[in-house]
């Protein structure tokens, strides 16, 4: 389950960065 949480955090960070840059 920790792996899922870590992956979700990475995806969220990437999404936020992309959204902000876009």
Curated annotation (Swiss-Prot):
<dbReference type="GO" id="GO:0009088">
    <property type="term" value="P:threonine biosynthetic process"/>
</dbReference>
<feature type="compositionally biased region" description="Low complexity">
    <location>
        <begin position="7"/>
        <end position="22"/>
    </location>
</feature>
<keyword id="KW-0028">Amino-acid biosynthesis</keyword>
<keyword id="KW-0428">Leader peptide</keyword>
<comment type="similarity">
    <text>Belongs to the thr operon leader peptide family.</text>
</comment>
<dbReference type="Pfam" id="PF08254">
    <property type="entry name" value="Leader_Thr"/>
</dbReference>
<dbReference type="GO" id="GO:0031556">
    <property type="term" value="P:transcriptional attenuation by ribosome"/>
</dbReference>
<feature type="region of interest" description="Disordered">
    <location>
        <begin position="1"/>
        <end position="22"/>
    </location>
</feature>
<dbReference type="InterPro" id="IPR011720">
    <property type="entry name" value="Thr_lead_pept"/>
</dbReference>
<comment type="function">
    <text>This protein is involved in control of the biosynthesis of threonine.</text>
</comment>
<keyword id="KW-0791">Threonine biosynthesis</keyword>
<protein>
    <recommendedName>
        <fullName>thr operon leader peptide</fullName>
    </recommendedName>
</protein>
């Amino acid at each position: 389950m920790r792996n899922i949480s870590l992956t979700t955090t990475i995806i969220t960070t990437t999404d936020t960065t992309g959204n902000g840059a876009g």
